């Protein structure tokens, strides 16, 4: 079989023009095509398009960097605000605790004062009740003594003794 391939290869003739085979003509055509492209300024246009694209990408990168810086600035600002809010909340909590303690102390003092006032009022009522009871007992004793004295005087005095007492009272008024 190798002999058959060799026989076929001997009979094939490569076409040539002006003594140049197809590979050389393709290379020449390619060089001419590339020359025309260079002559028309295609590489400059491609370079301009690439430069424009590079500029756009650089601009986008710059904007992205600025956005990143803005975001970091906002983040720092909000972290500071958050820290301030936490500090203010702690201060408010401390003030509320102090106010609550002051209110508790005031309530205790008010309760103690109220208890003392009520105790004093109760003691005053008891003293008044004792004084009233003592006055009633004295009045009853005076009334009983008066009634007993009146009864004794009525039993022991007669009209003559009454006349002598009246005369004596008139005489003491007249002297006076």
From Swiss-Prot:
Entry's localization field: Cell inner membrane
Keyword check for Transmembrane: yes
Protein name: ATP synthase subunit b
An example Gene Ontology molecular-function term: proton-transporting ATP synthase activity, rotational mechanism
CC annotations in GO: plasma membrane; proton-transporting ATP synthase complex
Coiled-coil regions, chain positions: none
Organism this protein belongs to: Sphingopyxis alaskensis (strain DSM 13593 / LMG 18877 / RB2256)
Described function: F(1)F(0) ATP synthase produces ATP from ADP in the presence of a proton or sodium gradient. F-type ATPases consist of two structural domains, F(1) containing the extramembraneous catalytic core and F(0) containing the membrane proton channel, linked together by a central stalk and a peripheral stalk. During catalysis, ATP synthesis in the catalytic domain of F(1) is coupled via a rotary mechanism of the central stalk subunits to proton translocation.
Lineage of the species this protein comes from: Bacteria, Pseudomonadati, Pseudomonadota, Alphaproteobacteria, Sphingomonadales
Subunit structure comment from the entry: F-type ATPases have 2 components, F(1) - the catalytic core - and F(0) - the membrane proton channel. F(1) has five subunits: alpha(3), beta(3), gamma(1), delta(1), epsilon(1). F(0) has three main subunits: a(1), b(2) and c(10-14). The alpha and beta chains form an alternating ring which encloses part of the gamma chain. F(1) is attached to F(0) by a central stalk formed by the gamma and epsilon chains, while a peripheral stalk is formed by the delta and b chains.
Membrane topology, as annotated: Single-pass membrane protein
Membrane spanning residue stretches: 18-38
Annotated family: Belongs to the ATPase B chain family.
Keyword list, A-Z: ATP synthesis, Cell inner membrane, Cell membrane, CF(0), Hydrogen ion transport, Ion transport, Membrane, Transmembrane, Transmembrane helix, Transport
Signal peptide range: none
Keyword hit for Transmembrane: yes
């Amino acid at each position: 079989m190798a002999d058959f391939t060799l026989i076929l290869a001997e009979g094939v003739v490569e076409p040539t023009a002006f003594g140049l085979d197809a590979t050389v003509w393709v290379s020449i055509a390619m060089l001419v095509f590339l020359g025309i492209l260079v002559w028309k300024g295609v590489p400059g246009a491609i370079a301009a398009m690439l430069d424009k694209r590079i500029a756009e990408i650089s601009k986008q990168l710059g904007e992205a960097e600025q956005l990143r810086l803005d975001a970091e600035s906002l983040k720092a600002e909000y972290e500071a605000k958050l820290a301030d809010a936490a500090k203010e909340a702690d201060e408010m909590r401390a003030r509320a605790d102090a106010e609550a303690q002051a209110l508790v102390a005031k309530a205790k003092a008010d309760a103690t004062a109220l208890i003392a006032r009520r105790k004093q009022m109760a003691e005053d009522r008891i003293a008044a009740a004792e004084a009233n009871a003592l006055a009633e007992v004295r009045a009853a004793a005076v009334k009983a003594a008066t009634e007993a004295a009146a009864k004794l005087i009525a039993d022991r005095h007669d009209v003559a003794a009454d006349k002598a007492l009246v005369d004596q009272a008139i005489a003491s008024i007249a002297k006076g």
